[in-house]
């Protein structure tokens, strides 16, 4: 049995693991990263962020072609199957894996394939296909990510019942689809399949879509999903899911029954903490498989850290990467350490959504004297040129100091547009001000110009 010694060992080669390993290596630590899959990238690259966003992009191009009058003059609408649009996603996945594998070799991080389990507080056992290795470490970072939560009373082995990972194995385009769970993943897939002409029933156990969003943005998403043919059912809980050779029947606790060609479960995720030997180091995950950490990403065992989806909120690839970097920054005593607690939300529905900061509801409950500046995309020259006129930018600011309190965007490129506002919000003191957008010259025509339009709109409300 081979034995190796490292300063830092990272378990999991997804975004948080990559961020942790790269940062530790840059600080001259001897680093190993352990991945139980054949290739790096984690759920983000293979089943989550990358394939779903590549799918969305392809579907959005199809929608643009089919709704643009200029294209209609030269041909009929075109429809593509789900497997066909998935081909582009597979190409992107391959490029991402190659790129990220090079990161490790270039930075002299040892990439070890195998399943890791703690033997004690300073040793890991790595079981590969043909060998067993022991690794001694000074510090460890658990970055094993998460997977879809699968209720035991639903038969996910049935060929018509999918979860948000296995849906990428779908070999045909269903005519009808039931999606259970109207969170971020469920809403994104509802947009994707509706764009392919699939009749979608979106079942929401809650009272409104994505309730953490600003109410106006949530309402806009509801409207556009319905406008694209998605039937949204709120306050519904499943009773049973039964599949047969001809379809799937969802029985709801309210007494309703819905039938479709396929069923997609998108309700909740669980941390990947099984078989890690956590009991050997005195760690116990919660009921969702997640590990508790302090403000330095340390678990209850001081030299063992955790980051990314395995610790829960916010379960975003962007935040996971920064959490991993932060965990290794604490190990290396990096002056740039920060606890990641203020991250923008990016939701890749069609149209997309992004926000950062407070919502109107939160500010109202806190009795903050705020006001609103709005810019509607239909009034922007760039949006008129591109034909992407659906959407808006909304700036929430303090009525007296003009401090920016929240940015909310709905429409094409929302996830890009939000970062301009985020950059100003993160400035200290008087630099965080609505005045920046009023006194700054923006390129024309651009979508960024929406900030000037919204700022002037908000300024006009002040008296």
Curated annotation (Swiss-Prot):
Binding sites annotated in the UniProt record for FAD: 35-44
NADP found in the keyword field: yes
Cofactor note: Binds 1 FAD per subunit.
Catalytic activity line of the entry: NAD(+) + NADPH = NADH + NADP(+)
This enzyme's EC code(s): 1.6.1.1
InterPro entries in the record: Class-I_Pyr_Nuc-Dis_Oxidored, FAD/NAD-bd_sf, FAD/NAD-binding_dom, FAD/NAD-linked_Rdtase_dimer_sf, Pyr_nuc-diS_OxRdtase, Pyr_nucl-diS_OxRdtase_dimer, STH_gammaproteobact
A Pfam family it matches: Pyr_redox_2
Annotated function: Conversion of NADPH, generated by peripheral catabolic pathways, to NADH, which can enter the respiratory chain for energy generation.
Family listed: Belongs to the class-I pyridine nucleotide-disulfide oxidoreductase family.
Name of the protein described by the UniProt record: Soluble pyridine nucleotide transhydrogenase
Organism the protein comes from: Marinobacter nauticus (strain ATCC 700491 / DSM 11845 / VT8) (Marinobacter aquaeolei)
Gene name as annotated: sthA
